[in-house]
């Protein structure tokens, strides 16, 4: 529903159109917050029922990599979870996804079965990361001849090169990449594409660029950078070197610069490769770091201190070799508009010793292989000009997605880009407009009457606190960089955590002619989400609900036609 306001005296809400799937799409907050719109409550119910294979396939249809994302997702669904509004913690949606992945049966019989009838169209995918693999997964069953190019020996992109094996076991990634490649994808691994023009000359009907943001930012102007180069490493390059087993050790004293998830992966990997005194040093305050809270917690659990409010001043070189770094202490100051500045405290600079330094201060895109006269326009920041709906560039046959489109994001965003780009490519190849003829996000609507014994759950709110995911002892995991730290929920814990879900996708609808306004539904509702109230302006109604409905982005359900003239409102 798009809330429709009228202007007849008061600004009253019109009744919700329950035939419009947009309302039911938006009201399931976790699903709406997921970039790939994974139907979260649906698969959580299946997990509670022990139907892990079905739960896995629900995920695979939307997010393509349930096993990967069940371990590594940035979890945009969890801040949106309604459970977090009545408890301190939302449902552990991400880790429940892993429960389905870890306990599934053979899922190949439930996947598209080739060979597929060719439709005569050919598509090139540059880069074999999550965005490109999603495009391949979506287009191949439609009969497209899909060619996948990557300079690495396997598919996976940054999921393979930048996410350490102690967070994402290689076998988990291999399995989910192979599910896609078995759909008849023509792979060209160990093949670096050096010219987009050459690709376009090969009669592809469309080209998708999913090459990520492969260039880590450096600190080239910091004094001592060149002299200490042998022991100063770019974080993402170093992680890739470790992943492909070109690097297997590091010095005992390590400084990691940066406050994002890459910095957390670098410091934890360094601990496993011989780093005994590893510390993260970041410019910003601890609370403002870009790293996910759980990533920071995991690093500190492994005895890695995070030193905030320190700006790097120089690399210190002694006898021609890196000896450490100096830092200036700063504090965050905010102006009237909330803009932050880092202001020196005036204290003396601080020296920290280091055998090695890992720089993880950000990533940049790099497209040296795309000729600037091939029809793809670039902006002032050397980023391709890409439409945010269709993911089409200024060259009608060339599409971008993942980090290559708008800069560094995460796996689930790359998957979402891949889905949308695949839709656009299919529209283009069928002679349709890539923007005006695309459909809204798909929503499953099932209308049913349910007796009390048909509910999969009881009607009360289970009082379980959010369960912590068990971890292997660090005295073992720190000795082996491939030893997975998180053990995942067992089936019983998965069931208990699944029962914390409020089933927001199960939507009651009101039948006003049958309502006698006894308010029994209000009294029995465990979440206090139903209100009978006088009609009026939307802002006023939102304040009058039993729990004020203050999230203006979230539509409220409204039904009228009661004999008293009141309206039924559900948030």
Identify the function of each model-found stretch.
Residues 227-251, 335-408, 534:
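FAD-site-proximal beta/loop scaffold in flavoenzymes
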Residues 100-117, 175-197, 216-273, 378-394, ...:
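Glycine-rich dinucleotide-binding loop and its adjacent helix/turn
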Residues 13-33, 56-75, 108-124, 160-161, ...:
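Ferredoxin-like iron-sulfur electron-transfer modules
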Residues 47, 117, 122-126, 174-220, ...:
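Feature captures the FAD/FMN-dependent oxidoreductase FAD-binding
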Residues 266, 404-429:
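A conserved FAD-binding loop/helix module that cradles the flavin
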Residues 1-9, 28-49, 70-100, 147, ...:
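Iron-sulfur cluster-binding cysteine motifs and their immediate structural context
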Residues 122-146, 262-271:
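N-terminal Rossmann-like FAD-binding beta1-loop-alpha1 element of flavoenzymes
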Residues 145-183, 187-188, 240, 267-314, ...:
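Rossmann-like dinucleotide-binding cores of NAD(P)H-dependent redox enzymes
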């Amino acid at each position: 529903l798009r809330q429709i306001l009228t202007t007849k005296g008061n600004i009253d809400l019109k009744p919700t159109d329950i035939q419009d799937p947009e309302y039911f799409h938006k009201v399931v907050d976790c699903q709406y917050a997921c970039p790939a719109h994974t139907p979260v409550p649906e698969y959580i119910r299946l997990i509670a029922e022990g139907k892990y294979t079905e739960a896995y396939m629900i995920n695979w249809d939307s997010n393509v990599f349930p096993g990967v994302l069940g371990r590594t997702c940035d979890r945009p669904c969890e801040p949106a979870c309604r459970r977090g509004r009545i408890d301190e913690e939302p449902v552990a949606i991400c880790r429940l996804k892993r429960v389905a992945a870890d306990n599934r049966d053979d899922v190949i019989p439930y996947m598209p079965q080739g060979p597929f009838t060719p439709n005569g169209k050919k598509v090139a995918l540059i880069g074999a990361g999550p965005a490109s693999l999603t495009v391949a997964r979506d287009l191949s069953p439609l009969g497209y001849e899909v060619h996948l190019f990557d300079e690495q020996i396997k598919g996976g992109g940054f999921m393979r090169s930048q996410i350490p094996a102690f967070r994402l076991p290689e076998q988990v990634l291999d399995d989910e990449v192979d599910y896609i490649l078995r759909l008849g994808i023509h792979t060209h691994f160990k093949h670096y594409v050096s010219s987009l023009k050459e690709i376009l000359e090969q009669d592809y009907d469309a080209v998708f660029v999913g090459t990520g943001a492969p260039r880590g930012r450096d600190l080239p102007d910091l004094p001592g950078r060149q002299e200490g180069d042998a022991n100063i490493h770019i974080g993402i390059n170093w992680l890739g070197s470790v992943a492909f087993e070109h690097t297997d050790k590091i010095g005992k004293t390590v400084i990691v610069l940066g406050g994002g998830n890459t910095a957390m992966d670098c410091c934890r990997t360094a601990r496993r490769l011989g780093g005994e005194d590893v510390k993260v040093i970041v410019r910003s305050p601890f609370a403002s770091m870009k790293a996910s809270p759980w990533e920071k917690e995991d690093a500190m659990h492994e005895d890695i201190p995070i030193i905030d409010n320190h700006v790097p001043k120089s690399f210190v070189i002694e006898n021609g070799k890196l000896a450490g770094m100096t830092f200036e202490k700063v504090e965050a100051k905010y102006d009237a508009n909330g803009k932050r500045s880092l202001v020196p405290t005036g204290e003396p600079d601080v020296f920290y010793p280091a055998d090695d330094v890992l720089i993880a201060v950000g990533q940049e895109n790099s497209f040296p292989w795309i000729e600037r006269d091939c029809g793809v326009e670039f902006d002032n920041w050397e980023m391709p000009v890409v439409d945010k709906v269709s993911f089409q560039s200024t060259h009608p046959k060339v599409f971008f997605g993942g980090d290559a489109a708008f800069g560094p994001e995460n796996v689930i965003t790359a998957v979402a880009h891949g889905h949308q780009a695949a839709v656009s490519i299919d529209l283009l190849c069928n002679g349709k407009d890539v923007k005006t003829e695309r459909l809204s996000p798909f929503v499953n609507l099932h209308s049913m009457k349910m007796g009390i014994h048909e509910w999969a759950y009881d009607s009360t709110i289970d009082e379980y606190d959010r369960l912590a995911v068990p971890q292997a002892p660090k005295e073992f995991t720190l000795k082996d960089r491939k030893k997975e730290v998180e053990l995942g929920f067992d089936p019983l814990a998965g069931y208990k955590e699944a029962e914390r879900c409020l089933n927001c996708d199960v939507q009651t609808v009101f039948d006003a002619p049958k309502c006698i306004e006894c308010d029994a539904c209000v009294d029995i509702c465990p979440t206090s989400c139903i209100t009978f109230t006088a009609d009026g302006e939307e802002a006023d109604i939102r304040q009058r609900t039993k729990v004020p409905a203050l999230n203006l982005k979230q539509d409220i359900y409204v039904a009228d036609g009661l004999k008293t003239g009141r309206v039924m409102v559900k948030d």
